[in-house]
Amino acid sequence: MNEQYSALRSNVSMLGKVLGETIKDALGEHILERVETIRKLSKSSRAGNDANRQELLTTLQNLSNDELLPVARAFSQFLNLANTAEQYHSISPKGEAASNPEVIARTLRKLKNQPELSEDTIKKAVESLSLELVLTAHPTEITRRTLIHKMVEVNACLKQLDNKDIADYEHNQLMRRLRQLIAQSWHTDEIRKLRPSPVDEAKWGFAVVENSLWQGVPNYLRELNEQLEENLGYKLPVEFVPVRFTSWMGGDRDGNPNVTADITRHVLLLSRWKATDLFLKDIQVLVSELSMVEATPELLALVGEEGAAEPYRYLMKNLRSRLMATQAWLEARLKGEELPKPEGLLTQNEELWEPLYACYQSLQACGMGIIANGDLLDTLRRVKCFGVPLVRIDIRQESTRHTEALGELTRYLGIGDYESWSEADKQAFLIRELNSKRPLLPRNWQPSAETREVLDTCQVIAEAPQGSIAAYVISMAKTPSDVLAVHLLLKEAGIGFAMPVAPLFETLDDLNNANDVMTQLLNIDWYRGLIQGKQMVMIGYSDSAKDAGVMAASWAQYQAQDALIKTCEKAGIELTLFHGRGGSIGRGGAPAHAALLSQPPGSLKGGLRVTEQGEMIRFKYGLPEITVSSLSLYTGAILEANLLPPPEPKESWRRIMDELSVISCDVYRGYVRENKDFVPYFRSATPEQELGKLPLGSRPAKRRPTGGVESLRAIPWIFAWTQNRLMLPAWLGAGTALQKVVEDGKQSELEAMCRDWPFFSTRLGMLEMVFAKADLWLAEYYDQRLVDKALWPLGKELRNLQEEDIKVVLAIANDSHLMADLPWIAESIQLRNIYTDPLNVLQAELLHRSRQAEKEGQEPDPRVEQALMVTIAGIAAGMRNTG
């Protein structure tokens, strides 16, 4: 562990030195000295030197407007470099994640040692593995794509520098390259000038596939196969690829008017274009590699006389021609040209799979297994994982949009107003229409633009090649009619298959009602016939936490899942729970392994489907090696959760959780909803209003342009509190509730829950992580600089509350200090704090200057505005999660 820290620290300091030289070359000695002074003061302030802390505040307050941007950029870029070094160390031979592929081996050994599990049972669990990662374009991926590419190359340089046998001239060359990359980053604007469009976001997603997943997935499968052979003597079948990728980019229209039916159609074409592009590169390699002559009679029959001389090449060249024709047609469609479909257009995965698999079988049969299991096997696995669509997309829309569309239709038809009908009447109407053979939509009807958009989206789904759209997610789902309404709209669009429609339950009340809603649906014969024994339900983490606080939300999520699992099991339905987690704790983010093992028993039987959000995509899948490591972690966790499920909680533990939930929700809502000072305090103590100006993501920050905290999306809500280091949404209410239960004499019971119930210990672990990242002296400084004195008592009250919360969590967990069991994470937070603290102090100063100017009716100073954006991005990098 210590070797790991020292290697990380020495790389961080080397990168910092190079950045310093870059700053000196660009701006002169004076700015570098200023930055160095601030860094030293910050380090000493962190070590507890109050005089230096005061000096740090004064130095940053006294910066001229010309010095603001260079200082903000220096610390922000430093944090990006530190994150890159940390990412490298997590996969370097000395690092923590280098052992992550080992996770699979460790899991398999652990499972083999359980007397009640036979090897056959373990094999069956492997064969039923299913992992679907849903990439979402959260506005929280602050870092621009161009800087991400440079950081990937910095990572490659660090890797080569670690090589012991490197010659001096090679070392010098690598150092020169590092200097170039860091200089390029310094001279690149780190803040986007324009908001990305939904198409830009989709392209960002394709870049992740191309730069990392394309290589990472086959590498992960080789690793998995190796561990299975070694531990179970079991070989993965060629066609077995347990991992799929889906995307919300270009499909998620919930609250985002920029995602239209036309955009979705465009993104679907673009995704197919990118797939042909990547497969063409693969096939080109195979054309040059597969020069073999010997082949089975089956393969020779397939290629005929024409291809007999080089049968494998012949098939590959044919496939190449089809890919090129497909790509040309897609390009024309993307330019808006309407062309007839060419001969040999690829629309289904089988068309790619069959010629490749024929070559594979022939090579195996002719004793050339070593060749078959090379690049050809990787390409076959890519066909199974990515296929013709590259990534499938989910469509997501808010339930009220469907209700409004049907209301407009029924009013036009003169049969009443669907929107005002009771739930029973809605269901009766929907089931009648779903069973009817005649169309419901009149030909000459001219609906409003909003309704037209809903209908056009259903049209896009009906026209898309089957298999390119994964599911239709209904956000803010509350009733069975919300689900039936979507099925009716899809039927009217002429969809010819049963599209998975997943209700998303995301407020506290909706989570509590989820099981009733699904029970009612499953009791409808028509519905049971449609779903063919499979149901997907999405659990919302971020909105429930914003609605009720993190403790009440996590218990409601647990109970909703638990009840749904039991209901579906009884009804013989295979349930897939789809988890809408975010990267930050307030949005359900927890280290994957811990989070999965803390779910109710049986929650992963139908596989794992989970959203991977903006900034977390880069931390978990930014490089092929990290992809292998992340997928291995998920695999180990799913196998363990399915074969060694966590215990059912005792009744007394459930009662304690009910109690904690009620108390914490009351405390949370008492502040957030009922305290009249809370919203003005939130608006002034955090950069919430300024965040709206950042060109982040294509989605507006509010669901409705007016309205208070409740209309704010969960992401900006959490983002804002992360910036001022109070981290309030991730803990408010939880500690107070724990304290109350301790005072009722139940501390020993809480300690037992912490020891023996993964759900509860994960909750406490997440609280510790939040407290480790929070900083009360900084939160207090924001108050002093930005908040009206009349509101100071509220800030003080919240900070005192956090101090009390930390004590009670440590007492229950029996820890002397925060993160005692995860020293690597604690070390990484400490390392970054030295660079994040000055950005926080500077941000408070910039907010003060910007608001002062606004108050005095002056135009905003572009230097202040730009520096403010940089501090927001820098603190997000320092906290390693944004919203």
UniProtKB/Swiss-Prot annotation:
Cofactor: Mg(2+)
Alphabetized GO MF terms: identical protein binding; magnesium ion binding; phosphoenolpyruvate carboxylase activity
Result of altering residue 587 to S: Loss of activity
Catalytic residues, chain numbering: 138, 546
Gene Ontology CC, one term: cytosol
Impact upon substituting residue 138 to N: Loss of activity
Catalytic activity field: oxaloacetate + phosphate = phosphoenolpyruvate + hydrogencarbonate
Subunit structure as annotated in this protein's UniProt entry: Homotetramer.
Designated name of the protein: Phosphoenolpyruvate carboxylase
Organism expressing this protein natively: Escherichia coli (strain K12)
Gene that encodes the chain: ppc
